[in-house]
Regions:
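Helical segment within the ABC ATPase nucleotide-binding domain
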Residues: 173-185
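Conserved ABC ATPase "signature" region
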Residues: 100, 104, 111-129
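Catalytic Walker B motif of ABC-type/P-loop ATPase nucleotide-binding domains
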Residues: 158-162
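Conserved ABC transporter NBD signature motif
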Residues: 60-71, 75-76
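Short, charged/small-residue-rich alpha-helical element at the C-terminal edge
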Residues: 230-295
């Protein structure tokens, strides 16, 4: 394995009966913040479980931090923090005991685990709630507790499966800021899945896109953004169909959304052609600006 790569897989496949959950997944990931994006059922959770050695792959090979995912799952899990999508907390425990227990399961002695539990609960914003029972927690507080459990042993890699699922806007913002801080300030590596592109963009600099068990994109977000066409957005009044046709007659690529036209910028003459089209179509231009789409 290359020294720069911490996760590598080759032709990773996972079958559940006749269902192909992972289809020849090939990954080459270095340290940093990586988002795994895809709709529900794309194979994100299955990929994570294979990387952690929690489930056996049907075929293919993979290593995490140099350890074989098929035979050295214990070694991998001792170095990785895992925040699963499913509810993994004991509602009858308070937060401090839940996190301490997670630390002990990962090989920490009780005193060390307790000290670290206090530290990570403060880090995730639950200092004042650490002695409350988890059954009384909101969804956001439960997600924060799961994150604390994943961080308790100071892992080299943090894997978060849909960490913002079910969160309100405030809790979502705090969760994403905490993950970003883990990378930016702590020098950690975060691998997070989501079906929401905005979440990935706030934390990550690289992206893996999955669809039907396949990895279809694996590159930096910056490189991906360069491939998106720049557009001019024009809001008009009257004669939208005529305006659209006039733009196309001039050889421009246009997307129409009601009274809003988004025209691909071809060169420095594009704005002039848009204004010319509006004059020919006899429409009023209410707004004209450069449109910057997100991913």
């Amino acid at each position: 394995m290359s020294e720069d790569l911490i996760i590598q897989t080759q032709n990773l496949r996972k079958l559940y009966g006749p269902h192909l959950a992972l289809d020849d997944a090939n990954l080459s990931l270095s340290r940093g913040a990586i988002g795994v994006l895809g709709p529900n059922g794309a194979g994100k959770s299955t990929l994570f479980k294979c990387l952690l050695g929690l489930i056996t792959t049907t075929s293919g090979n993979g290593t995490v931090l140099g350890f074989d995912i098929r035979t050295q799952g214990d070694m991998i899990r001792s170095r990785i923090g895992y925040m699963p999508e499913y509810d993994s907390l004991d509602p009858n425990l308070n937060a401090i005991d839940q996190v301490r227990y997670s630390g002990e399961l990962l090989g920490m002695n009780p005193a060390q685990a307790m000290q670290r539990a206090h530290e990570v609960l403060e880090y995730v914003g639950l200092r004042d709630q650490r002695y409350r029972k988890i059954e009384s927690f909101s969804t956001g507080m439960k997600q924060a507790t799961k994150l604390a459990c994943a961080l308790v042993h100071d892992p080299e890699i943090l894997i978060c499966d849909e960490p913002t699922n079910g969160l309100d806007q405030r809790s979502r913002k705090f969760m994403l800021e905490t993950l970003k801080r883990t990378v930016d300030d702590g020098g950690g590596t975060v691998l997070m899945s989501s079906h929401v592109m905005d979440d990935v963009q706030e934390v990550c600099d690289r992206i893996v896109m999955m669809h039907k068990g396949k990895i279809v994109v694996q590159r930096s977000i910056e490189d991906l953004a360069r491939q998106i066409d720049r557009e001019i957005e024009v809001v008009i009044w009257g004669g939208a169909s005529k305006m659209e046709n006039t733009l196309k007659e001039l050889g421009l690529s246009v997307r129409r959304l009601g009274r809003v036209m988004r025209v691909t910028i071809q060169d420095e003459n594009t704005i002039g052609l848009v204004i010319e089209s509006a004059a020919k179509a006899g429409v009023q231009v209410r707004e004209l600006r450069e449109y910057e789409p997100d991913l």
